[in-house]
Amino acid sequence: MTDFDGIIIGGGHNGLTTAAYLTRAGQKIAVLEATPQIGGGTSTEEPTLPGHKFNLHANFFMGFGHAPLMRDLELHRYGYSYIEPPVQQAGAFRDGSCVVIHQDLDKTCASLAKFSKRDADTFRDLYHRYVVEMRPLLVSLMYNAPLPLDQLTDRLSGPKAKEFLAHSKHDLFSVVADYFDDDRIRTLFTSYMHVITTENVPGSGMVFPGIFANVTGFTLPIGGAVAYPLACARIVAEGGGVVRTNAKVREITIESGRATGVILDNGTELTAGKFVASGIDTPTTVEMAGRELFETEAVEKLDNWHWGNHSLVTLHLALRDAPVYKARDFDPDIDEAFNIFFGMDDLDQVRSCFIDCEEKRFPDVLMGNGSCNSAFDPAYAPADGHSAFWWPFAPYTVDGDPANWDEQKKDYTSRILNVWRDYASNLDDDNVKAEFLYTPLDIERHTPNMINGAVRMGAYIPNQLGVNRPHPSLAGTRTPVEGLYICGSGVGNGGGMNGAPGYIAANAIVDDLRLKRDWTPVAAPEWRD
């Protein structure tokens, strides 16, 4: 007799998504998390002062309003909900100007038109195309196993589909430059395109439609990002399963070519009657199961997995008052914006930042985005305060050694805060009650499978995206090992807070085991115009 129907390795949001769906399919599930708390990239902590909550990783749940997860899992019943602030994004510049992106399309276009009427018209066209008209296609692409380009091309036809596919021939910078004219608008949208830490390399333009589709789809989890994994854990518990922390898996047991369970670091063996699914990084998963069980080409690629040229360094501030941005004189709505970009005033500065990251230097130009979550949900801070953060791009190895993040943390904190003060007028010592710098090295410590501070568990470059993430034999979450699945961010459509790998793996397991499901899978991608 086995201990569980299925075992999930890793208690991050993808592993728990798979667990919640399989629980709803009638399975008894065990989720095993190596660290003291579940959540992985969806964690919420109080690193500054009591009552000031910060999402250490995922904060902007992009496109979550269109994801099947809320509906299928009835997450509202288990404590998860979110808000969509009406003023979604903004870009502030040192000259005091700003661009503001609203959920109201006309207001957004009015903001853009202050710089370029043509760019405002272009934005309106792109909005109708990707945010509205092609949204169903983009959702289906996200929540189905990725297809090889030839198969995808067969399923998409017409002028709009042709334009959609043509993005994959270009890099992100050139795609943005082709669409927009004004330098500040180009600078903002180039920065926005890197919000998922995509590398600017040939072929990276393929992500443009999907990212643009979420330009007004940023959601904030009420009470903290950890509310999502906690909701999934409640579903698992309700179905008779367990979620264990401090349960590090050492080995995936294989018998007669089939995954049958796991062995923990302490020697405890747990058995699974039907499947094992891994939500941690793919290279480690392959090692735990046995390299010889996988295609040689896939193993070689994972041996040389590119974790990324840049990570993020986050300054968390416990404040008395929310930041007031100097650009409010240009457009007062900037103080209402959920996601604010600043630090970059032109494209040369954007390029400079990423060159410094690639060459492993602390950037001369600090640029990134952030938020004051407590301005939208009071649960993020005490009644007499606010919680704000800013996460500039930065390399994992800085000035020759990752340890420099620890040794020079005070200096880096001061430099980052001083840049923030260039844009916000009230971040003086009287307003800042406490500060906490969360570095790329801290990311790896907190979530060990984010190796080298890789917040996406692998760089977003063309040969590590879609069917190539990580390899065609693994991208769809199934593996060559019977009963073993990979449901983490290192496969298929993974790398952001979308639950897609977990969802895709759950559907694959249900299909393979011929289980009954109480949800309707997202339809396969198809487009004809």
Where are these regions (language model features)?
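Flavin-binding catalytic cores
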Residues: 116, 322-323, 358-363, 381, ...
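Mid-domain catalytic core of redox enzymes
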Residues: 220, 250-381
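A glycine-rich dinucleotide-binding beta-alpha-beta segment and adjacent secondary-structure elements
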Residues: 182-196, 362-371, 426-492
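Rossmann-like flavin
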Residues: 94-202
